[in-house]
C-alpha cells in the first residue's frame, strides 16, 4: 500500500532527473546569454541545489501526509480486552474471586496451586 503512494513521487523524481540531465546536454547558456530580457540565470550548481531542495521538500510533504493518515487510522482503532472462556481462565478468575472475598469463606479456604507455576508440573515434582 505504501508503494502505491510513493509511485507518483518516483515518477516525478525520474522526470526531474531526466530533465536535469537533458538540461546539461543542451547548451542553454548561450541562448540565455544572448537574450537581453533574461537578466537572472542560474549556474549549474545553483540549479542542482534548487532541484535537490524541491525533491527534499516534496519528500517531506509526502512523509507528513503518510504520518497523518497513519495517525487517523490508529486513532480509530479501539482497544478491546480479549475474553477468555477456557477452563484455565475460568479457574484463574474463580481463584481470584475467592482470594478477594472475605469472611468465613476465607477462613475455611485452603489455597490450591493455581497459577502459572502450577501448570506443567510432573508427578515427581509434586511428591518432592
UniProtKB/Swiss-Prot annotation:
Family membership: Belongs to the calcitonin family.
Subcellular location: Secreted
Range of residues in the leader sequence: 1-25
Primary gene name: Calca
PANTHER family: CALCITONIN GENE-RELATED PEPTIDE 2, CALCITONIN-RELATED
GO molecular function: calcitonin receptor binding; hormone activity; identical protein binding; neuropeptide hormone activity; protein-containing complex binding; signaling receptor binding
GO BP, sorted A to Z: adenylate cyclase-activating G protein-coupled receptor signaling pathway; amylin receptor 2 signaling pathway; artery vasodilation involved in baroreceptor response to increased systemic arterial blood pressure; calcitonin family receptor signaling pathway; calcitonin gene-related peptide receptor signaling pathway; cell adhesion; cellular response to nerve growth factor stimulus; cellular response to tumor necrosis factor
Residue positions, PTM Phenylalanine amide: 119
InterPro entries: Calcitonin-like, Calcitonin/adrenomedullin, Calcitonin_CS, Calcitonin_gene-rel_peptide, Calcitonin_peptide-like
Main localization of the protein described in the UniProt heading: secreted
Disulfide links within the chain: 84-89
Annotated source species: Rattus norvegicus (Rat)
Entry keyword Disulfide bond: yes
Top-level taxon of the source organism: Eukaryota
One Pfam entry name: Calc_CGRP_IAPP
Known function: CGRP1/CALCA is a peptide hormone that induces vasodilation mediated by the CALCRL-RAMP1 receptor complex. Dilates a variety of vessels including the coronary, cerebral and systemic vasculature. Its abundance in the CNS also points toward a neurotransmitter or neuromodulator role. It also elevates platelet cAMP. CGRP1 can also bind and activate CALCR-RAMP1 (AMYR1) receptor complex.
Protein's name in the database: Calcitonin gene-related peptide 1
Gene Ontology CC annotations of this record: axon; cytoplasm; extracellular region; extracellular space; hippocampal mossy fiber to CA3 synapse; neuron projection; neuronal cell body; neuronal dense core vesicle
Alphabetical keyword list: Amidation, Cleavage on pair of basic residues, Disulfide bond, Hormone, Secreted, Signal
Propeptide positions: 26-80, 125-128
